Structure formats: C-alpha cells, structure tokens
C-alpha cells in the first residue's frame, strides 16, 4: 500500500493532544512498541531507504499484544515521502524473526517507543516518543493519501508544509549528530 508520510519535529506533546481534542479527532492508538529493524549484513535495504521490521505492540488500554511483520521501501522523497508498506499481523513473533533471518537478514537495531495515534479527515496523526537513547525529541508523523489532505491537516493543527520534513528519522538523527547502532547512521 502506498502512503504519503511526513514529520513535524520537536513538538509540544500536550499542545498536540489539546488540538486533537478540540478537533474531535478519534484516538485510535495508545501503545508501547518495540521495533526490530532488519537488513542484510551489507545494509543495502537501509541504504536505499527501506527495511524489514518486526513490531511488537502492547495496547495501553487493553494490554493486548500484537506482532506485525513489515517491509517498507521509499518510492520517492520530495515534499513528503511516498512509501510502499507491506504489513501483516503474525501469530508468532519468533517465527517472523526466523523468517527474516532465513532470508539472510540480520537484526540491526531494536527501538522502543510510545505511540499515540489519532484519525482525522481520513488521515493518521501519530505522536511518537522514542526511547531517549535512540531519539531524544518527540515528533509527529502524519500519514495521508494526498498533498491536499496533508495541507488541510497541517493547517488544522497550526503548521504548514514548511514545518515538515520528508527525511527519514535516521537522516534527521544524523543531521543532529546523534549516533545510532545501525551501520551508516
């Protein structure tokens, strides 16, 4: 599935929550995540702005655990990122890990974060608060289907396209001099 994706960095989390409430946005997620990023030993997926991932989520409201197996690949990067995402829920996280490993992929990094997601105008607005050792600042990720919808959402929450970035989180961290475990970042 293709999605348009952009980020707004260094947000005021309480301000965004208040805006979501005032806009009557529907809260669809409040979860803790562990994202295990896989790539080949030579790093070719990440070098081409893609990756394989096993994501384990724990819903903070119900306690339910869900495991997703995903591949992502950037198709283009301009005002926003156009991503191809292929994802499925799996019954057995360990089996998902073994499948990736059997394809020659190796675990590159394991990233913990809290994510709070809202739906508004057929778009998803996500507050991401990562483990500080990975990314020390909160940000918004907005996923939608058109530039028009993106501009509309941004206006509703007090931002413009100029406030956004299509850079990957790894590019943003590298720009800020924040080193990570993954080769080349």
Tell where the protein language model's regions lie, with residue ranges.
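Conserved, surface-exposed functional patches that form binding/active-site neighborhoods
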Residues: 109-144
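Short, structured patches in soluble enzyme cores that scaffold and shape functional sites
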Residues: 8-10, 92, 129-131, 143-146
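A structural feature that tracks compact, well-ordered secondary-structure segments
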Residues: 51-57, 71-72, 128-130, 143-145, ...
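Short, well-ordered alpha-helical microsegments
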Residues: 13, 147-150
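N-terminal strand-loop-strand beta-hairpin
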Residues: 1-122, 160-161, 166-185
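Bulky hydrophobic/aromatic packing residues
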Residues: 139, 146, 175-178
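Long, well-ordered alpha-helical scaffolding segments within enzyme catalytic domains
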Residues: 151-162
């Amino acid at each position: 599935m293709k999605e348009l994706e952009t980020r707004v960095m260094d947000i005021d989390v309480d301000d965004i929550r208040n805006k979501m409430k005032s806009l009557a946005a529907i809260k669809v997620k409040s979860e803790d995540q562990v994202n295990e990023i896989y790539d080949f030993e030579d790093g070719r997926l990440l070098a081409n702005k893609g990756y394989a991932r096993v994501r384990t989520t724990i819903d903070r409201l119900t306690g339910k655990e869900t495991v997703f197996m995903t591949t992502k690949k950037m198709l283009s990067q301009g005002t926003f990122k156009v991503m191809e995402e292929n994802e499925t829920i799996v019954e057995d996280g360990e089996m998902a890990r073994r499948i990736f490993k059997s394809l020659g992929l190796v675990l590159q990094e394991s990233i913990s974060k809290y994510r709070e997601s809202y739906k508004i105008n057929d778009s998803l607005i996500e507050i991401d608060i990562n483990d500080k050792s990975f990314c020390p600042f909160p940000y918004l990720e907005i996923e939608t289907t058109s530039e028009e919808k993106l501009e509309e959402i941004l206006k509703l929450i007090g931002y413009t396209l100029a406030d956004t970035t299509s850079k990957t989180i790894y590019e943003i961290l590298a720009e800020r001099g924040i080193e990570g475990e993954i080769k080349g970042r």
